[in-house]
């Protein structure tokens, strides 16, 4: 049983036959013993890694599991698109928006030859109409940024419906049928990451959650951002991949 000091999402804790307790995001496990102020002070004094291991029951190796954070290079200012660059918008969509379900995640890359910049990440639980709206917003935001563009959507569940709906609106997404399991797909992309080919921003509103999921993988509870990332990197590093041929308007 996983009972973090501060609930990281809405959960239902089974207490026995026909008994359960609902914990909401941010609920404290023992507020009488450890208040939010006390826990914040502990986190500040211990550091987030040790606090996560001791109080949140989510130990993350300092360097990471499958992927080390030290492999990534960082950038302060987003790269200015150049001729030949490609924007890759990669979606891993959930089957449901239930508070206990997986997230839908979108990872946006700027690919410049063998150098990759992660420029945006979106992660949310969305009903299908809101999911489609989010896909269209990301598409409209990024499709004209670089000379080449690809929209990737995993061909499963709500992703299949999205691909069909977008096609009817004249938007041609690349339907990705993944091979192998999640670990194999991400492991196949670790070599270029370790070689320093992938860059992340120094600061971004999505960076902390992205880093946490990345370093916890493959033992993290959620891996939607990982799936979207590995899918995007597979295209970015595919041998002889022509830029801008697929995933159009």
Feature map (PLM): residue ranges:
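ATPase catalytic-site recognition across NTP-hydrolyzing enzymes
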Residues: 16-93
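Short, glycine/acidic-enriched loop or turn micro-motifs at the edges of active sites
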Residues: 93-95, 123, 157
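C-terminal nuclease/phosphodiesterase catalytic domains that cleave nucleic-acid phosphodiester bonds
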Residues: 49, 53-58, 97-101, 107, ...
